[in-house]
UniProtKB/Swiss-Prot annotation:
Family assignment from sequence similarity: Belongs to the GatZ/KbaZ family. KbaZ subfamily.
Highest taxon in the source lineage: Bacteria
Name used for this protein in its record: D-tagatose-1,6-bisphosphate aldolase subunit KbaZ
InterPro entries in the record: Aldolase_TIM, GatZ/KbaZ-like, GatZ_KbaZ_carbometab, TagBP_ald_KbaZ
Recorded GO CC terms: plasma membrane
GO biological process: carbohydrate metabolic process; D-tagatose 6-phosphate catabolic process; phosphoenolpyruvate-dependent sugar phosphotransferase system
NCBIfam families in the cross-refs: agaZ_gatZ, PRK15458.1
Subunit structure, interactors included: Forms a complex with KbaY.
C-alpha cells in the first residue's frame, strides 16, 4: 500500500511524520474524518476491528465487504478519492473465538483473513496472542508467531487470487491491555521492553521464513507495542517519553519498521506529537471520537430542552439510558460500583461503551428527532456559547454553520485536528 510504505520511508529518513487510524464504524465519525482528510488533502486510514466486522457480521452486522461498501459509498458522496482511502483490519486472528479449541478458532481466523483481504483491506494486523480453549496461558512467542505466519500466507494467497498481486502491508504484535480501554482503574503501566519487542520480531521473522514468506518482511511495517499510554473510565495515563526511550531507540535499528500505538485516545496534543517523534508513528484513535460525538449530542440535547416544550423533545438522553438498561451486555462487565457510579459511567466514561448503542433503532429515531427539532429555526448563539463553546468561536468568525449536523461534525474534527498535527512531521 503505497501511502503507508511511503510514510514509513519518510519517517525512517527523519521526517518525524506519522499517520492516524480512525477506528470507528459510526457514520458521523467517518463523515467527519473523510471531510477533514479532504480539506487537508491527506490520505485517510480507517480500520475495522475483528469484533466490529467479521465474516459473520461482527457486532455491527457488517462483513468486511459490507464495511468497505459502506465507507466507499460515504467517500463517494463526499467526493473523496478512493485511492486516498486506506482500509485496515485490526486484531485479526482467533480473538472472537477464544472459547473454541485452537484448531477450530484458527480455521475461523483463516476465513476472517480471507474475507478482509478479498474485500480490499490493505493494512492487516495479525494478532494471534490470545489463548484458545485448549491452549496454555499465556502462549509462547513461537506459537503466536507460527499462527500469525499461517494467516499471512492465507492473506498473500487471497490477495494474489483477487487482485493479481500481493500489495498488503502488515502489522504484528499486540499491546498488553485489552483493546478499547482498560476495564480496571489504572495508575501505572508497564512499557514494552526492548527485549520483548525484539523477541516478538525474531519469532515472527523465523516463523515467516518457515512458511517461505521471507520476501514479505519489508512489508511488515509496524510492531504493536505498549509505549505507556492507556485510559480507564475517568483517568488517562499520559505518555512519559523517558520511560519509553530504550524502546524508541531500539526500532531505529530496523530499516523498514516503526511502532503502532493503540489506546492513544485522550492523550494531550503534546503527547501525541512526542509519540510520533519517538517512532510510535501509527496512532490508533476510536473511543475519543465517539466520546466527542456523544459530547456534542448531549450538548444539543441540553439546547433542545431550553428551546422545545418538554412533550415535543426527543428525550435522547433518557432513550439512551433506557436502552442501555434494557440491554446491558455492552457495559455491565465494564462498569462497577453503586447505581450512581454506573449511571455516570454509562453516560460519561472515557471507555465510551455507549458507542455500541448508537445503531439501535430507538436511539437513532431519538437522534433524528433531536436534529429535526433544532434544524427548524436557528439555534440562538448564546446557547451555542453555553454548551458548545469551541464551536461558538468558529460560528462567530463565520467558518462554521450553526446547524446541528455541522456542530457535531466540527466537534469530532477538533479531536482529528490534534492527530493530524501530531502526524504532520517536519
Amino acid at each position: 500500500m503505497k501511502h503507508l510504505t511511503e510514510m514509513v520511508r519518510q519517517h525512517k529518513a527523519g521526517k518525524t511524520n506519522g499517520i492516524y487510524a480512525v477506528c470507528s464504524a459510526h457514520p458521523l465519525v467517518l463523515e467527519a474524518a473523510i471531510r477533514y482528510a479532504s480539506a487537508n488533502q491527506t490520505p485517510l486510514l480507517i480500520e475495522a476491528t475483528s469484533n466490529q466486522v467479521d465474516q459473520f457480521g461482527g457486532y455491527t452486522g457488517m462483513t468486511p465487504a459490507d464495511f468497505r461498501g459502506f465507507v466507499c459509498q460515504l467517500a463517494d458522496s463526499l467526493n473523496f478519492p478512493q485511492d486516498a482511502l486506506i482500509l485496515g483490519g485490526d486484531h485479526l486472528g482467533p480473538n472472537r473465538w477464544q472459547n473454541l479449541p485452537a484448531a477450530q478458532a484458527m480455521a475461523n481466523a483463516d476465513d476472517l483473513i480471507k474475507s478482509y483481504v478479498a474485500a480490499g483491506f490493505k493494512k492487516i494486523h495479525l494478532d494471534c496472542s490470545m489463548s484458545c480453549q485448549d491452549d496454555p496461558v499465556p502462549l509462547t512467542d513461537d506459537i503466536v508467531a507460527e499462527r500469525a505466519a499461517r494467516l499471512a500466507k492465507v492473506a498473500e494467497e487471497t490477495c494474489r487470487e483477487h487482485f493479481g498481486e500481493a500489495d498488503l502491508v502488515y502489522v504484528i504484535g499486540t499491546e498488553v491491555p485489552v483493546p478499547g480501554g482498560a476495564h480496571e482503574t489504572l495508575s501505572e503501566l508497564a512499557v514494552t521492553t526492548p527485549d520483548a519487542a525484539r523477541a516478538t520480531l525474531e519469532a515472527h521473522r523465523h516463523a515467516f521464513e518457515k512458511q517461505g514468506l521471507s520476501a514479505i518482511w519489508p512489508r511488515i511495517i509496524a510492531l504493536v507495542v505498549q509505549p505507556g499510554v492507556e485510559f480507564d473510565h475517568t483517568n488517562v495515563i499520559d505518555y512519559q517519553p523517558v520511560k519509553a526511550t530504550a524502546l524508541s531507540q531500539m526500532v531505529e535499528n530496523y530499516e523498514t519498521l516503526i511502532f503502532e500505538a493503540h489506546s492513544t485516545d485522550y492523550q494531550t496534543p503534546q503527547s501525541l506529537r512526542q509519540l510520533v517523534i519517538d517512532h510510535f508513528a501509527i496512532l490508533k484513535v476510536g473511543p475519543a471520537l465517539t466520546f466527542a460525538l456523544r459530547e456534542a449530542l448531549f450538548s444539543l440535547a441540553a439546547i433542545e430542552e431550553e428551546l422545545v416544550p418538554a412533550k415535543a423533545c426527543s428525550g435522547l438522553r433518557q432513550v439512551l439510558e433506557n436502552v442501555m438498561l434494557d440491554r446491558p451486555e455492552y457495559w455491565q462487565s465494564h462498569y462497577h460500583g453503586d447505581g450512581n457510579a454506573r449511571r455516570l459511567a454509562r453516560g460519561y466514561s472515557y471507555s465510551d461503551r455507549v458507542r455500541y448503542y448508537w445503531p439501535d433503532s430507538q436511539i437513532d429515531d431519538a437522534f433524528a428527532h433531536l436534529v429535526r427539532n433544532l434544524a427548524d429555526s436557528p439555534i440562538p448563539l448564546p446557547l451555542i456559547s453555553q454548551y458548545l463553546p469551541l464551536q461558538y468561536v468558529k460560528v462567530r468568525s463565520g467558518e462554521l454553520q450553526p446547524t446541528p449536523r455541522e456542530l457535531i461534525i466540527n466537534h469530532i474534527q477538533d479531536i482529528l485536528a490534534q492527530y493530524h498535527t501530531a502526524c504532520e512531521g517536519q
